[in-house]
Amino acid sequence: LNVDPGKATNRTVVTFVGHTEAVIEAAFLAIKKAGELIDMSKHKGEHPRMGATDVCPLIPVSGISMEETAEWAVKLASRVGKELGIPVYLYEAAQPDKKRSNLSVIRAGEYEGFFKKIKDPLWQPDFGPAEFDEKRGGTVIGARDFLVAYNINLNTTSTRRANAIAFDVREAGRNVVENGIKINQPGSLKSVKAIGRYIDEYGVAQISMNLTNIQVTPVHIAFDEVCRKADARGVRVT
């Protein structure tokens, strides 16, 4: 359906659709080929990442349930781990342990931090070796609903200010300390993940968002809220 490469992120998103067995086979072959062509030890980019195939979500489009899609995700993850020897983590609907189901939580530490993280008993992969592959890294495979990736540029080059706005709006919010106690302060938008980052090719900072349920938070609501939060911090959306 689409191939979307990004220069600053050094990342390409490939979207394809088809019958279940064909999609699973295509995904497996794509993961295999990415591992052959991409050397993660030399990779740099503005987007969080942990492997040559960073994440592989399966999405039920028609004639298949989320539960069935999750079962296929597990089958694909098992095959990747066994046949390719890549550490694989399940996420979203395919992950039974909800403490490990969030992509950003799994990917925390990124490629550079996973050599240590994978040794933690709490972060053993679901499939494949508990050894981080220097060239191919690891991958995350799961089943989820449709997601809208939406970026908003700001009239600033400050990643710090962009992150502050991202934390204002994202559902996870930020951790703050009150009376010596660390508490979570939720953001204003449900079903939204967001980070701030500087995009060299544009020369500006931006809010990079994933809208995980556009029935809960549609694009126009996310845009308006980012505008409000940016304005409150003396920043404009461009």
What are the language-model segments listed below?
Residues 1-238:
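Long, contiguous binding/interaction regions
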